[in-house]
Amino acid sequence: MNNIGEIISNFEGIIGALLGVIVTLILTHILKHFGQIKFYIVDFEIYFKTDNDGWGTNVMPSKDEAKQIEIHSQIEIYNGAEIPKVLREIKFCFYKNTNLIVSVTPDDKATTEEFAEFGYYRDKLFNINLPSKQIIAINIIKFLNEKETKQVKKCNRVYLEAKDHNGKMYKVFLGEF
């Protein structure tokens, strides 16, 4: 037993330095990952539409007569961690009180590409890369067809839901209708 005590006392400085380095590495790793993702809703609009006599649509004041729904939202997202993060599986989720009725993947307005006078194409928003200690703004939009609109008419709340790189679910209230 004395042998071990002698060895430890002889190498006390080296062992202390190694333990200090290990503890510092662990704490640095933990602190870099520490930080929240915060959402700020800048704008949220929901339009209830019905077909008019011509080629267009009319915006209706109530969801009862709507045949289509158009949703616009501008959201700022802040990553408070010192490492980049990613949000996946982004969805507009429609609830009736606390029950999920339907969820749809929004389109990214930044990728709008017009290919005709009345036509366009947008990419779906599947993931968002969040740089460290920065805020980004996203503009998202979704047109719901008649089938989806029938389901959404039963709802009264809409949320934005997404998962981070660890699978943690974020649920952000957008509005009531």
UniProtKB/Swiss-Prot annotation:
Q: Which compartments does it reside in?
A: Cell membrane
Membrane topology, as annotated, equals: Single-pass membrane protein
For this protein, the parts annotated as crossing the membrane are: 11-31
Single GO cellular component term: plasma membrane
Note the superkingdom of the native organism: Bacteria
Name of the gene? yopI
Keywords (A to Z) from UniProt: Cell membrane, Membrane, Transmembrane, Transmembrane helix
What protein is this chain from? SPbeta prophage-derived uncharacterized protein YopI
